[in-house]
């Protein structure tokens, strides 16, 4: 725990940026029956019936000292998605000697994901670019990206999202 707190206290170093990473499931659920219109002074009424449009995974990272945010939406949360996200992250920091990533102990969060996804040479290069710092068990709250997910959930994800993964992905790539 102290190691992560010490990382957050370090001054900004573009050669060794500190990035916080995590992922979150997102369920794509729409209304089957339209709710009642809201009247003045009353709350909106939603019907309990819904339609499922599948699920997806939001992968996100923040750089706390600069405020930079990165996100991907993917249909699943596997080692392939993790490795591809880390490769994209490495591409965003071409001059960095080491990218320090704070993340939890999920089974996909390791260097073997690189070797599973990419050829050995690419995986080895990626492995050299990263230093993983894992949050202690039951202490994922130390990861600052959790604050971002909390805000994102309250503002967007904790409601019915009545679009398909394809539509949501098209919206992500349009930004």
Q: What are these regions, as identified by a protein language model?
A:
Residues 19-21, 100-103, 133-134:
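Short beta-strand segments
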Residues 1-87:
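Extended, low-complexity cationic-aromatic segments
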Residues 97-109:
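Acidic/histidine-rich, metal-coordinating catalytic segments
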Residues 27-29, 108-111, 141-142:
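Short catalytic/ligand-binding loop motif for oxyanion handling, primarily in non-cytosolic enzymes
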Residues 104-105, 132-154:
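RNase H-like two-metal-ion nuclease catalytic core shared by retroviral integrases
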Residues 156-165:
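Short, polar/flexible loop-turn hinges at active-site or ligand-entry regions and domain interfaces
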Residues 81-100:
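Short, basic/hydrophobic alpha-helical segments
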Residues 167-170, 174-175:
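Single conserved hydrophobic/aromatic residue that forms the stacking wall/gate
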């Amino acid at each position: 725990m102290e190691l992560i707190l010490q990382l957050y206290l370090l001054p900004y170093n573009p050669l060794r940026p500190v990035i916080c990473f995590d992922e979150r499931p997102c369920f794509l659920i729409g209304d089957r029956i339209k709710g009642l219109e809201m009247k003045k002074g009353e709350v909106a009424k939603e019907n309990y019936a819904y339609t499922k449009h599948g699920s997806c995974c939001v992968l996100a990272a923040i750089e706390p000292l600069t405020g930079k945010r990165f996100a991907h939406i993917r249909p699943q949360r596997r080692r392939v998605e993790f490795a591809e996200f880390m490769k994209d992250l490495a591409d965003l920091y071409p001059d960095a000697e080491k990218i320090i990533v704070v993340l939890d102990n999920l089974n996909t969060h390791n260097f073997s994901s690189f070797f599973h996804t990419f050829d050995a040479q690419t995986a080895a290069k990626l492995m050299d670019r990263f230093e993983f710092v894992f949050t202690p068990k039951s202490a994922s709250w130390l990861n600052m990206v959790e604050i971002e997910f909390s805000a994102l959930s309250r503002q967007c994800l904790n409601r019915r999202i009545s679009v398909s993964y394809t539509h949501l992905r098209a919206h992500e790539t349009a930004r």
